[in-house]
Amino acid sequence: LDFDLGTLLEDIADTLAVRAIEKELELICSVNPTLPQWYKGDPGRVRQVLTNLIGNAIKFTAQGEVVLHYELILSSDGRQLLRFTVTDTGIGLSKEQQAKLFQKFSQADSSTTREFGGTGLGLAISKQLVELMGGEIGVHSEPGKGSSFWFTLDLEIAEAKIEPIK
């Protein structure tokens, strides 16, 4: 399925902006004009993963910002991959917490569940979706310094579609 990545990212940002505004957070979605805009893939799965990562970033950030950034990178075997990164100025995670993060029903600890809510399924589902699309997902984080969740996808570039004006 061909999809317009820029439009998809704008839709996601628009959907989550209300939550960010309620918490007085800055939600920054940096669309890279030098990269192709159209890709072949599953926009529904991409949307679900990004919505989950950005939603979590907003949930666990009390002040500051949540930034979505994407870029093309080269894999170790020379393939071009699209790498998405969601960075926040939130509570951050210890190495021990990071190790359990992508398991089902896992949250940083029980106090996190009480304070922030949620089932602990979001990251496990995101990991599964990313892997179904042939990608990888990971996190870099430090307690008190925020987190940076990333995932890579091997999406084929599609021909740009020009939509008729309605």
Which residues does each predicted region cover?
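Disordered, acidic interdomain junction associated with two-component signaling
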Residues: 22, 30, 75-80, 96, ...
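Conserved catalytic submotifs in the C-terminal HATPase_c
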Residues: 1-4, 21, 26-37, 73
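Short alpha-helical segment within the cytosolic histidine kinase core of two-component systems
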Residues: 10-22
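Glycine-rich ATP-binding loops of the HATPase_c
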Residues: 134-140
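Short helix-loop "hinge" at the ATP-lid/N-box region of the Bergerat-fold HATPase_c
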Residues: 57-58
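Short conserved segment of the HATPase_c
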Residues: 93-107
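Short alpha-helical Gxxx[C/S/T] motif in the catalytic ATP-binding
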Residues: 117, 122, 126
